[in-house]
Amino acid sequence: MGIRKYKPTTPGRRGASVADFVEITREHPEKSLVRPLHSKGGRNVYGRITTRHQGGGHKRAYRLIDFKRADKDGVPAKVAHIEYDPNRTARIALLHYADGEKRYILAPARLAQGDVVESGPGADIKPGNNLPLRNIPVGTVVHAIELRPGGGAKIARSAGASVQLVAKEGMYAQLRMPSGEIRNVDIRCRATVGEVGNAEQSNISWGKAGRMRWKGKRPSVRGVAMNPIDHPLGGGEGKSSGGRHPVSPWGKPEGRTRRKHKPSDKLIVRRRKSNKKR
């Protein structure tokens, strides 16, 4: 993937860039693997906003992605197409299995149209192949990793994401996450060799607010810019600091949204480095 920069013909074009899509081999998805997707606009079943800054955007169709692949062990598949998926940052690959079935998977880097991939304990260590962690050599870079055997891929699924297998001890494999955290995962869990493709996606400059609206993202307004009826930090004469610690629109302290004690914390071997200022 490459990035194409626009000439500054308008204020919205100035500094904007877009993917060149050279790896895309087909424009329309496989109809049998597409499902309708209803836009919720950040609302729940009662019509109340539960997630702010969402809504609008282009209509999308959901592509069914195979995050398990265990039921296709030993069945080779040919990469028929590399396609665009509006629901994720990664590209997706359409596989034609030898038994006639078609499925989508996340397209790893260096996977091209015409390549053959397979899954199972005996698969080769090459991009796109899916194996249990116990059958993958230490030091291998992997993505789309399960947290529980048979649970489907949960870790490292976005564009450019990868995890390194650094050790195996007993029933656990140690994985180095992109954050630097080292975590134990059941050695029976499956992973796909290689890193997720489309790594340059993070370097795209959107250029204007309208492009984010096309993606379904609405503006985020600062609390200090609101009126006091709308936010605890609102109001004041001129530009104010808000006069208190940052809080949500409902008065709860900003940040600290994660649980202090998660059951899976015992599987963390080494914590990620904190960015807090000492």
Curated annotation (Swiss-Prot):
It comes from the Bacteria. One of its GO terms (biological process) is cytoplasmic translation. This is Large ribosomal subunit protein uL2. PROSITE patterns: RIBOSOMAL_L2. Pfam families: Ribosomal_L2, Ribosomal_L2_C. Gene3D superfamilies: 2.30.30.30, Nucleic acid-binding proteins, Ribosomal protein L2, domain 3. Residues 210-278 are annotated as: Disordered. It comes from Acidothermus cellulolyticus (strain ATCC 43068 / DSM 8971 / 11B). GO terms for cellular component: large ribosomal subunit. The gene is rplB. One of the primary rRNA binding proteins. Required for association of the 30S and 50S subunits to form the 70S ribosome, for tRNA binding and peptide bond formation. It has been suggested to have peptidyltransferase activity; this is somewhat controversial. Makes several contacts with the 16S rRNA in the 70S ribosome. GO terms for molecular function: rRNA binding; structural constituent of ribosome; transferase activity. Part of the 50S ribosomal subunit. Forms a bridge to the 30S subunit in the 70S ribosome. Belongs to the universal ribosomal protein uL2 family. HAMAP family: Ribosomal_uL2_B. Residues 210-220, 257-278 have a biased composition (Basic residues). Keywords: Ribonucleoprotein, Ribosomal protein, RNA-binding, rRNA-binding.
